[in-house]
């Protein structure tokens, strides 16, 4: 403890002596991070030291945050820093650097607020506000958020709601900034109403003042239902009483409309304008309040908020209003909105803003119904590149990374294509063997376990068969996947079922020939269309050859003069002529009518 007493009196920077002080206290500790039992021992010592410092400050009559103040002579402003804040700074530095347990600083702050008076608590809380950024870091917040919440709640209980309004507001603002938006402890998960906030009003009529006291009691009795709207759905009599009282108030507002001049006179649009947080319920003010446009808006807005609660989404069936109650709610809501619209100043704009807020409120209600899931996103760390350092561009041997890896793999595996253990395309007989075994009735394999139900297996098998056995692949359309299996692999009992019959083979061959003939016909038709011009030229040559043959034929007188010695020559000439004639005729026939192929 003496080591820390001396440490808080030093003027040197905290980082130069904080860790050494801890290591000196826990001997022979030389590590930069304490163990669990060492943390507990250090925390107990610090709490004892803090208690002694607070007691000494109380005896001296000084404020605890200024007790044992240190004056920095080097600073012109005479920076005053007491021993207790200096001790808290040392512990906060150790927690931030993770030399000690992160929740230690929060425990010391809780002890300090409990030992301080309300006047000193303001100074302590001022120190907490100044260290809000450090205390809110994730490594510290996770360890001490519950302790800090308990500390602030204890302060709020000790403060007076009437005299310490500003200090209460500071605490609430700190909690709003310190905790995330999705913190469950601040959203009233169960929807509990503050029924202790009662609006008190006069029960007996005053003497000597002419006031419609029945209307006065009816008007302020509505606050009992606004304070606890859930009571309206528990009993139908309460809803009937509330609806009748509300109808009286709305009728009065209708009977006493406000003019634009009255609305402008009572407007709270000025920057310095204020209003009371509690209603003034004196019966003497009833007439003036009815002429106040802001007062009317407060009452009508309370009605809309309560109606919105009664119809809130996500409620249980037992908490929902009845059908009759829903109709009355609708009529009352329409009437309230109409009164808000005609209430000056700018009634339509005010009503539109209220409707927008109530619509957005449904998102909040659903979020609470879903258990308040967190919706904050951590900021992305922006890593700035080193200034002046340019990243070297990587070069690849073959243009890109994949090609270079493939080339290196080929160099590193020279026997990849000749290795006997390499992956090969299987033979269809080996591939279809498991399916053939499934088709054996004697094996007793159930259908749901057959390989034919494996779509990947069948797809691969069809690809292999299409490359190696086209005839077997053609059986797929008629017999299914089992027909693709080679016949020699099938068991004898089912082989006849999937074996192709001779007549079927003949039909298949004839069908293939027919397909081949049709292809030839199409080729001939294309050939005819391409050789029409050549046919015309061929016909002219044939006519020329025929005229030459007639000119060379001898007359009858010449045949008699030649006599029998030339018979053989004449016969040969006649045969030649006949052959030439037939040849010319065939040529004409071929050119005019090309022969049709015989199927």
UniProtKB/Swiss-Prot annotation:
Feature: compositional bias, Basic and acidic residues: 502-522
Recorded phenotype for the gene knockout or disruption: Developmental defects as well as reduced levels of endogenous trans-acting small interfering RNA (ta-siRNA).
GO MF annotation terms: RNA binding
Cell location: Nucleus
Annotated coiled-coil segments of the chain: none
One of the record's GO cellular component terms: THO complex
InterPro entries xref list: THO_THOC1 (IPR021861)
Region (Disordered): 376-395, 497-599
Superkingdom per UniProt: Eukaryota
Residue stretches of biased makeup (Acidic residues): 575-585
Keywords from the named record: mRNA processing, mRNA splicing, mRNA transport, Nucleus, Plant defense, RNA-binding, RNA-mediated gene silencing, Transport
GO biological processes: defense response to fungus; ethylene-activated signaling pathway; mRNA export from nucleus; mRNA processing; regulatory ncRNA-mediated gene silencing; RNA splicing; ta-siRNA processing
Pfam family, one: efThoc1
Functional description taken from the UniProt entry: Acts as a component of the THO subcomplex of the TREX complex which is thought to couple mRNA transcription, processing and nuclear export. Contributes to the integrity of the endogenous trans-acting small interfering RNA (ta-siRNA) pathway. May process or transport a long RNA molecule so that it can be a template for secondary siRNA production. May participate in the trafficking of siRNA precursors to the ARGONAUTE catalytic center. Required for the generation of functional messenger ribonucleoproteins (mRNPs). Plays an important roles in plant innate immunity.
Subunit comment: Component of the THO complex, which is composed of THO1, THO2, THO3, THO5, THO6 and THO7.
Protein's recorded name: THO complex subunit 1
Organism whose genome encodes this protein: Arabidopsis thaliana
Gene from which the chain derives: THO1
């Amino acid at each position: 403890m003496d080591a820390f007493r001396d440490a808080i009196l030093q003027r040197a920077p905290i980082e130069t002596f904080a860790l050494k002080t801890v290591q000196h206290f826990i001997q022979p500790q030389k590590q930069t991070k304490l163990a669990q039992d060492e943390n507990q021992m250090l925390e107990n010592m610090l709490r004892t030291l803090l208690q002694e410092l607070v007691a000494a400050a109380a005896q001296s009559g000084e404020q605890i945050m200024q007790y044992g103040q240190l004056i920095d002579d080097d600073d012109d402003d005479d920076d005053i820093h007491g021993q207790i804040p200096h001790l808290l700074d040392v512990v906060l530095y150790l927690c931030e650097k993770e030399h000690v347990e992160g929740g230690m600083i929060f425990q010391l702050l809780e002890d300090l607020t409990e030992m301080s008076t309300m006047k000193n608590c303001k100074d302590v809380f001022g120190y907490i506000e100044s260290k809000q950024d450090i205390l809110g870091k994730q490594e510290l917040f996770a360890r001490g958020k519950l302790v800090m919440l308990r500390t602030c709640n204890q302060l709020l209980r000790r403060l007076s709601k009437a005299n310490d309004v500003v200090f209460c507001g500071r605490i609430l603002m700190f909690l709003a900034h310190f905790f995330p938006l999705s913190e469950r402890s601040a959203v009233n998960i169960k929807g509990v109403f503050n029924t202790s906030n009662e609006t008190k009003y006069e029960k007996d009529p005053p003497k000597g003042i002419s006031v419609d006291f029945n209307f006065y009691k009816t008007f302020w009795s509505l606050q009992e239902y606004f304070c606890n709207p859930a009571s309206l759905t528990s009993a139908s009599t309460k809803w009937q009483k509330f609806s009748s009282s509300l109808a009286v108030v709305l009728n009065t507002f209708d009977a006493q409309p406000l003019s634009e001049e009255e609305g402008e006179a009572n407007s709270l649009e000025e920057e310095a304008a204020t209003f009371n947080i509690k209603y003034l319920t004196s019966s003497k003010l009833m007439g003036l309040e009815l002429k106040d446009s802001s007062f009317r808006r407060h009452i009508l807005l309370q009605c809309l908020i309560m109606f919105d609660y009664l119809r809130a989404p996500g409620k249980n069936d037992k908490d929902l209003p009845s059908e009759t109650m829903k109709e009355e709610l609708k009529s009352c809501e329409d009437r309230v909105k109409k009164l808000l619209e005609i209430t000056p100043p700018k009634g339509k704009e005010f009503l539109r803003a209220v409707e927008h807020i109530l619509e957005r409120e449904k998102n909040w209600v659903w979020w609470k119904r879903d258990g308040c899931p967190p919706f904050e996103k951590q900021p992305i760390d922006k890593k700035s590149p080193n200034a002046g350092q340019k990243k070297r561009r990587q070069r690849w041997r073959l243009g890109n990374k994949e090609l270079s890896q493939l080339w290196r793999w080929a160099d590193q595996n020279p026997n990849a294509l000749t290795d006997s253990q390499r992956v090969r395309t299987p033979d269809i007989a080996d591939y279809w063997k498991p399916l053939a075994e499934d088709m054996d009735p004697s094996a007793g394999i159930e259908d749901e376990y057959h390989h034919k139900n494996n779509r990947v297996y069948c797809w691969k098998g069809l690809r292999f068969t299409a490359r190696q056995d086209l005839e077997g692949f053609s059986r797929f359309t008629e017999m299914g996947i089992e027909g693709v299996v080679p016949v020699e692999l099938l068991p004898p009992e089912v082989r006849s079922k999937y074996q192709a019959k001779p007549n079927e083979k003949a039909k298949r061959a004839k069908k293939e020939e027919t397909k081949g003939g049709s292809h030839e016909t199409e080729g001939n038709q294309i050939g005819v269309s391409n050789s029409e011009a050549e046919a015309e030229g061929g016909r002219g040559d044939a006519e020329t050859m025929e005229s030459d043959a007639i000119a060379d034929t001898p007359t009858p007188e010449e045949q008699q003069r030649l006599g029998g010695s030339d018979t053989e020559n004449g016969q040969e000439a006649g045969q030649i002529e006949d052959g030439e004639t037939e040849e010319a005729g065939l040529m004409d026939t071929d050119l005019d009518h090309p022969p049709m192929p015989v199927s």
